[in-house]
């Protein structure tokens, strides 16, 4: 268990030497905490021996003097404002010491109530609310901050999200304090509006969003207040920022603004406006305000201050009417610039108003000029509405930022809420107006709620449940005052509403109405109905639960109407600033059809709002912080006995103590109690089949066997009532002792269940998988069988289609083969290639060896010279390669040729003639010579054509390194040899037949056989060859270019013509 902070004589919370408390020794600590009154007073005033006013006051004073500002009345926290900083009781260590503790295990503190609130929210899943009441200056706002701070630190769940939501809610408090709080005569930081903060939680107890509702902003404070008071803090704060004011063209001096200087109070010793404004700026950024939106806010605030500086003077030129004109045009111009609206339109709206006459088709509008008083009232009303709508838009923006949609989308469900109500305290001033009437009315409603929930309803519940009870009815019941104010058909508010509907109603007529209906009401007094001379003729006194208050009716009607002429609304609706335009985008004085309707008065709006709030509070489980002002002078650590006594009386503290002391500290439905504590009794654990009440009785009997609890418990019809907190703690102790063994049992059973469930699921899964695998195998086998037969059918079909390509003599060559059924283009192309190869093999196989050799030569020639678009040189692929052109009958010297060949074979060892024909050889001087060229399997021979005598030695074929020719239609060929052999350049077209392809094919083929090397065939233009060598074997290259015969000089045979130097031209014919 967490350490228990005990109270001692020196410190309210001994956080330095905290004692660890277990459930076993709690009763001793509880007893010491209660009865240690000689040192610090009673922590819980329900334990007063004599419930008398003096005893209660002495206990509060004793604790206050020892720096113990918090005291319990049951589960309520009484907080006495010391007007000093008690930082030592709000440290992080102190806060942690309250976590997971019960209220009476720890010293009185707001932290204890916050922990109790949060714990009940977790256990019951019911919405909770904290109602903070007390006079103005009693510390309500600070109490709400302390409560919020504790909730933000103890919530569980998604830490990042929680810190984000709670941080935003806390940041919003800083903004709302700046815009909604002000200095009054009784309080330096008085809330001038009521707010209800709702923190929304999910099922795990994690805050997921928030919502803020506000009630009755005291907007009249913008333009008027008592001497010594200030307007809202934000006006003084933003004037401290020179960067903003200089940008807006405003003065930093608050005395320059009429709205601020009238009350003659500009600064407060306890508040640093500049430092606080920096916090406001940071909070606005955290709450997703953009720089542009913040700039619009400062412009609206600046405009409001300058509106107060607009002055009016009587317009003497309009002598027949009481009219005015604006005597400060520069100020008006600056206001229009800040609001980004038409200066002319704004001026007309301030000094005149539009009045609608007639209805329907006869409806018309006229301009009515305003007098001095009316113009000032319009000016002030304009400033009030501007600030009111600005404040409302700020709250709307905060709500949109902290809402569940902004932070969590639809992933979370709101299970319950904690509401924190911080509303005006009871106010009594020297001059009490409409605002004080409404504020005190709201406090009456809250006091009535407290009476109903704590005093009346609790006693009524005891009687309803059949619990023996002696009724306590000597508390102050404020129901008659509530009826007086809001009664139907006649009440103060009802008569005020009627007066507002009558155009000529005055305070005198209104007080007459009040006297007429309420002169005999004991809670109402006026000048005419009483002998109290302090009450003026236009005033009345209400005897509130806190104190009698006299109200001045002088401005009741005007403030309740809260008028704003349509002209000003239309002017604002034309603003170019989107933010300002959004403040006036809904004209509240017209219905959806655009027809003017009767505006709802301020009192009616607040009455509806406070009744809605009371209805919402009634649905929550309430918790109370009762704030008491220690003195009226705001003196530090000073206890004003009489001032505190007065507050104790009207807060009904004595009656609350009597009800708590005589009553029961805890009550719970039998079903819920049985569900939480049934493990205490073996009869009810783990199952109970009887009625819930009998089950609870069995639990109480089991607890009484350990500690006498029977006398502490009373059994109602539907609920169990427990007398003291120690008994409730006893039940909780027993539950905590048994829970570990139950947890182990539950874990064991749960784990066994999980394993068995897993085993069954796994077994079922394996069975299903087995069945599925078997099905898949069967399905796959069937599919394979179907595929086999199908493929067999498709193959046979395809083979039948291929039959024309397998039957001679042409085998359908040149036709596209049928495509496969698979539509695979690469396979189709491959089949086409395979067929061509097969066709070639069939054709070649039927040929003789000689024919095969010729075919191979043709194929090689095709590779060397190409065909079609890839043809490299013109050649005749259809011509038969004859090889020996000199042994046929066309050669007259056939016999001489044959004899020379025989001699050559014998001498040189050659075995085969690859090519023999007459050619023209180019000699080393570039001259053409007719020679017989014989290419054998080993050599190249050159013979004289006349006698067939050999010219020089034969050239070995394996010495050839390359062949070159042009890509033209000439018949010349260069055969390149290894050095020092000079190249051979010959013309193979002597008989006008192209034989370059045949010679090249033979040479390439034979050199490959001899050397295993493929000599290159190069197509060049110009072509270079080595034609001669000197004694040092230095070659002389000829460069041959190619050209067509000049026109008119064409010849059938190509001609070699030597040019200058080592150049030459070969002429050829295109045909």
Curated annotation (Swiss-Prot):
It comes from the Eukaryota. GO terms for molecular function: actin filament binding; ATP binding; calmodulin binding; microfilament motor activity; phosphatidylinositol-3,4,5-trisphosphate binding. It holds the Pfam family Myosin_TH1. Residues 610-632 are annotated as: Actin-binding. Coiled coil: none annotated. The keyword ATP-binding applies. GO terms for cellular component: actin cytoskeleton; actin wave; cell leading edge; cell-cell junction; cytoplasm; macropinocytic cup; macropinocytic cup cytoskeleton; myosin complex. Residues 739-768 form the IQ domain. Signal peptide: none annotated. Myosin I heavy chain is single-headed. Dimer of a heavy and a light chain. Inability to self-assemble into filaments. Belongs to the TRAFAC class myosin-kinesin ATPase superfamily. Myosin family. This is Myosin IF heavy chain.
